[in-house]
Structures are given as C-alpha cells and as structure tokens.
Amino acid sequence: MDFDLTATQQAVADVVTSVLDRDLTWQALVDGGVTALPVPERLGGDGVGLPEVATVLTEAGRHGAVTPALATLGLGVVALVDLASEEQQDRFLAGLVKGAKGGVLTAALNEPGAALPDRPATTFVNGRLSGTKIGVAYAEQADWMIVTADSAVVVVSPKADGVRMVRTPTSNGSDEYTVTFNDVAVADSDVLAGGAAHRVNQLALAAVGAYADGLVAGALRLTADYVANRKQFGKPLSTFQTVAAQLAEVYIASRTIDLAAKSVVWRLSEGRDADDDLDVLGYWIASQAAPVMQTCHHLHGGMGMDITYPMHRYYSTIKDLTRLLGGPSHRLDLVGAQCSSN
C-alpha cells in the first residue's frame, strides 16, 4: 500500500490549505469551491471520491477549523454519493453545487447509550420514523439529515412535522442537537434503497478518522513550533530531553492515527473489507488522541490554557469526536469482539 497523496489528493490539499490559511470559516470553504468537490460532475461539482474528501477533512483538522465540514462532507455527501440514486442526489446535493449559498448536510447516527449502532433503536415502519438521536451536528442549519433506523436509511428535513430539536453543549462550541422523531412521515423517494446503518457508520468513522488525523497532526505541529521558539534558561524548550521525549510520544500517536485513517479510506474506496481497520482506528482515536492533546497543552505551559490560542480548538474538538465514537472502553469492546469472532 502506498499512502502518499495522489496528484488529485495533493491538488485538493493545496486548495483547502490556500483557503484555510486565509480564513477558517465555513463560508470561506464554500466560496473556495471546497464543498462542491465531491458533488457529481453532472450537478456542477468535481466528482472526487472518498480519498479526496478524507484529504479535505484532514486539512481542515490540521488547521483546527471548526466548521460543518465533517457533518456536511464526511457524514452527508459521502453517504449520499455511495447510497443514493441519481434522482435523490440531484435533490439532496443541490445546495452544495458551485454558485449555491452553501448548504449544510448532517447525519443522525448516535442514540442514547449507543454510539454508531448498526442496529438502531429508531424505527421505520410503514413510512413512519420514530426515535431519538443524539449528538447531531448542525441539525438546525441543515437542509437534510441522513437518519439510520432499524430497517432503512432515510433522509429527512429538519423542518418536517414531528421533528423536535434540543440544542446540547459541546466542548468546541459548535452546534449540536438531540433530535426526536415522532411518527415523522417519510416518502418512498426519501428512502436510500439498499442503505444500511452499518455502511453509513463505516463511512462516518472513516470521515471522523480523517478529521482526527488532521487535528492531532496540527496540534503536534503547533506544539513543536512553540517549544522550538520558547526559551528557558537561555535554551529552546525543544532541546530539553524530557520535552523531546514527550513530543516523540505525540508524534508516534499521530503517525499511528494517520496510518489507520488512510488504511480505512483505502480499503473502503477499493471495496475491501475494512471492519478490523475501522475498529482499530476508532479505538486508537478514542484512547490516544485526547491524552496526546493533554501532552500538547502541558508543553505549552500557561499559553495552552488560553481559549483564544489555537490549541484549544484542537483539544476540544478531539474531546467531541471521542464522545461521538463512544469513548475508549466502548471502542475496545468492539476490537475485542472482532478478535473473538475471528
């Protein structure tokens, strides 16, 4: 496996970097054409695939950008391109084409006590959707929500009758909601034929992995630059053995997450079995990303406690992603289940 960026991925990375180096906002990504990259060419997009979307998310994470990029591109567009018919894509992706105002998509996947469940408690019976989803990013702003249910994957408007939203707190301050569906009517044309919660969860975890990869790499770069320039006793902090050793631990975790994230994306894009790699990726993010962020904070000293300093965005977002994945104990249970089944 060669995990070097392809020419297309490098071009995508260059575009995202050029945008985010100037402005970290969602509108900047929209104006820069980034949101249209995975939209099919017939709709005015560039038609790039999962590896390129992962590149977008990694670069967004590397810059510490807190935007609807993960929800829209990673949880929304990727699943629709994979599962929706052309007619459905034409409707649901209309807000992301070049020249549009910048639509937002999201996915309602998690449930109370269940992170990315392959067998959701949310029910879909006779065209009616009922259940509760938690941790739904940007639900109120979204044009459409992809919802996993016990027997189908459906697309619902947040404004549909029977949809109730309550905003819930996040570490990084981004918008997140608990969404309750009370006998919501869903047309046959809004059901993703052949869609299954397991597939949607696979794609979602791959997207989260790409974003987390960038977040840890960005925090590592920020910290390495800080200790190289911050002097103590007349010497850069980076020359102290303990500092160098701690930074090396962050580097090891960063490289491992990068390897796992890219392996998952490669396997999914090639149609290979990715379940084992996905479980390893989920566990490594949930168990290692937050601790190495703590190390980065520690190496920044008092500067790391300033919420206006970029380090705060990296750490707080990783905390939210860890919660989305269900935490380290849950992810370790999934790894153990894979080992026992094999």
Language model features with spans:
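Amphipathic alpha-helical segments in well-structured domains
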Residues: 50-54, 73, 89
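Anion-binding (especially nucleotide phosphate/pyrophosphate-binding) glycine-rich loop
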Residues: 60, 65, 74-76, 97
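FAD-binding core of flavoproteins
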Residues: 94-221
